Amino acid sequence: MPRSLKKGVFVDDHLLEKVLELNAKGEKRLIKTWSRRSTIVPEMVGHTIAVYNGKQHVPVYITENMVGHKLGEFAPTRTYRGHGKEAKATKKK
């Protein structure tokens, strides 16, 4: 079920404060965050946010197309290495 419009989007306060502070200064530097649940808002466009995937921080450059999505969508947590290969049969004489 979608979130109510009267509530607005969710962005962690500490992350939004950092973005607004950088916008006021006119700086564009890497912002580290563990908040995968935060929604991308228009104020974040042009920034690079390092989103934690459980192992490392994955740098994500925010574009206009990403607005409305969650930060966690762009930092995959699982690495798929393919299905297991069948063991080669040994040749017997």
UniProtKB/Swiss-Prot annotation:
SUPFAM superfamilies: Ribosomal protein S19. The keyword Nucleotide-binding does not apply. GO terms for molecular function: rRNA binding; structural constituent of ribosome. Keywords: Ribonucleoprotein, Ribosomal protein, RNA-binding, rRNA-binding. GO terms for biological process: ribosomal small subunit assembly; translation. GO terms for cellular component: cytoplasm; small ribosomal subunit. It comes from the Bacteria. InterPro entries: Ribosomal_uS19, Ribosomal_uS19_bac-type, Ribosomal_uS19_CS, Ribosomal_uS19_SF. Coiled coil: none annotated. Part of the 30S ribosomal subunit. Forms a loose dimer with protein S13. Belongs to the universal ribosomal protein uS19 family. Located at the top of the head of the 30S subunit, extending towards the 50S subunit, which it may contact in the 70S complex. Contacts several RNA helices of the 16S rRNA. HAMAP family: Ribosomal_uS19. This is Small ribosomal subunit protein uS19. It comes from Thermus thermophilus (strain ATCC 27634 / DSM 579 / HB8). The gene is rpsS.
